[in-house]
Amino acid sequence: MGQAKQFDPRERLDHAVDAFWENGFDGSAMQALCKAMGIFPGSLYGTYGDKRQLFVQAVERYMATVSAEAVETLARDASGVAALRRYFGNLVDGILGGKRQWGCLVTNTIVELAQRDPDIRAKLDIGLARLETAFAGAIARARQAGEIPGDTSLDSAAFLVCVVQGMNVLAKTRPSRQRLESIVATALAALGADRVASTNHRKSVTTAAMIVPSLPA
């Protein structure tokens, strides 16, 4: 006999998200999922369907919350470079002290299921496309503001997506902050952010030197 549905399905789905995020699809047994969600098998099947159906809902929930919040970060700052630094800073902090130490549910699922489940892969492709579009927007703002070279291609957004996916995989090895921040610095340097900042600094120093009044002999 199933448990009466006296629970918030969305709240319990969030627990399933965490279970799949940490252990993957194959590594999450139904008994363990029931325990993580705090419900009986009858309630799980009656509310969410079978394991695959639950997993699909968990991935969609993850993309609508964790992924969406990360993507929104890239649009919050008028400065494109500041937005990129904030995004990667949050990613590094999450890897070192949050759930990101499990990697990323999207990335993990690409590795585990993309080759054997085309329907799930299609959902993941949508998530990656949204991230790439958000990166392209930040790059465009940075380029327009002169924060990076004007000829920086918007296709660099795909490169940043690859950097993120690599960091998500690396997260499972418990990397140091120094290593993660070095990766981020290298990625931003590839966009020319450091080069433009250095040039602007030299111009500022030169301008300041030109306006300093000469001291009397």
Predicted regions and their residues:
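N-terminal intrinsically disordered/low-complexity leader segments
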Residues: M1-F7, P149, R195-A217
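Generic hydrophobic, amphipathic alpha-helix propensity
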Residues: D8-V17, L33-C34, A58-Y62, V66, ...
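Helix-turn-helix
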Residues: E11, A19-Q53, Q57
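Hydrophobic alpha-helical connector segments
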Residues: Q57, V71-W102, S156-L160, S204
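Amphipathic alpha-helical packing segments from all-alpha helical-bundle domains
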Residues: A82-R85, P118-Q144, D155-A158, S182-A185
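Amphipathic alpha-helical segments used for helix-helix packing
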Residues: A83, G98-D119
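Amphipathic C-terminal alpha-helical segment
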Residues: G94, R141, V161-Q178, A190-T199
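Hydrophobic alpha-helical segments that form the core
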Residues: W102, T107, D151-L170, S182-A190
